[in-house]
């Protein structure tokens, strides 16, 4: 009897070992630093799925290890060279034009309004639009309100933007909004912004407080003004090539974990 149990246990461990050895590794690309709250959430997601031993292992590669721009990540996911990422709706609008609506200034009344829109049928409809573009939309992120920062002066009214060269995401609405405020909007990859500010190529940027703190933009910008002009969400996306390589049970487990982000 003991010998029989030993054989069963050995067979079980052998099969589990094979599953582990054959597990697919999915790398999640992120432009933000390792301590950024986005990556803390993505690591939570990865740990949650990894512990289920479904034959898929997730690994977050932060700090632009797979590229310095979210646009490059989106192109990579379409081509299948980037497996998964969390990107902003601003650059996504360059591939799915409807996403640019999230770059409208002062679009959401408050956090409750923001969450209600994205957690309902409207949010689901936008995630579904990614299918035709070679991507699978999994979940939304709250990136927070974006505020103006620069090294010259505080911004308390639109006229204060005059003469300021401000980095924005590559979104037509964002570019037009900052220009309408009197600034000079300059689309640039997020990973290049710190150096551009340090070298004086740009005067400032606009982003959420968490990003400014985590990526240390306060070292190269003196003023952070609470303008709350944009609140574009982030979207967690997987390449359709990667998604289609997964089994139905794996897809279900991943979707369930992503829904809790």
Task: Label the predicted regions.
Residues 24-113, 121-124, 128-261:
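N-terminal secretory/targeting leader peptides
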Residues 1-9:
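Bacterial N-terminal signal peptides that target proteins for export
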């Amino acid at each position: 009897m003991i010998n029989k149990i030993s054989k069963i246990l050995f067979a079980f461990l052998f099969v589990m070992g094979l599953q582990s050895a054959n597990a697919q590794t999915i790398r999640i690309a992120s432009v933000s630093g390792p301590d950024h709250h986005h990556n803390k959430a993505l690591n939570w997601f990865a740990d949650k799925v990894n512990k289920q031993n479904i034959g898929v292992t997730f690994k977050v590669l932060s700090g632009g290890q797979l590229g310095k721009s979210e646009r490059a990540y989106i192109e990579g996911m379409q081509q299948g060279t980037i497996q998964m990422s969390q990107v902003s709706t601003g650059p996504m609008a360059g591939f799915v034009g409807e996403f640019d609506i999230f770059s409208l200034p002062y679009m959401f009344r408050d956090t409750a309004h923001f969450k209600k829109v994205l957690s309902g049928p409207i949010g689901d409809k936008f995630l579904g639009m990614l299918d035709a573009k070679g991507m699978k939309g999994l979940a939304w992120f709250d990136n927070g309100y974006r505020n103006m920062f620069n090294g010259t002066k505080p911004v308390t009214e639109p006229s204060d933007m005059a003469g300021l060269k401000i980095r924005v995401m590559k979104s037509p609405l964002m570019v037009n909004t900052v220009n309408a405020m009197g600034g000079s909007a300059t689309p640039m990859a997020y990973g290049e912004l710190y150096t551009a500010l340090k070298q004086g190529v740009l005067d400032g940027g606009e982003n959420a407080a968490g990003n400014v703190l985590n990526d240390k933009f306060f070292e190269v910008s003196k003023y952070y003004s609470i303008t709350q002009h944009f609140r574009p969400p982030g979207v967690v996306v997987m390449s359709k090539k990667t998604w289609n390589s997964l089994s139905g049970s794996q897809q279900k487990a991943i979707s369930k974990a992503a829904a809790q982000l």
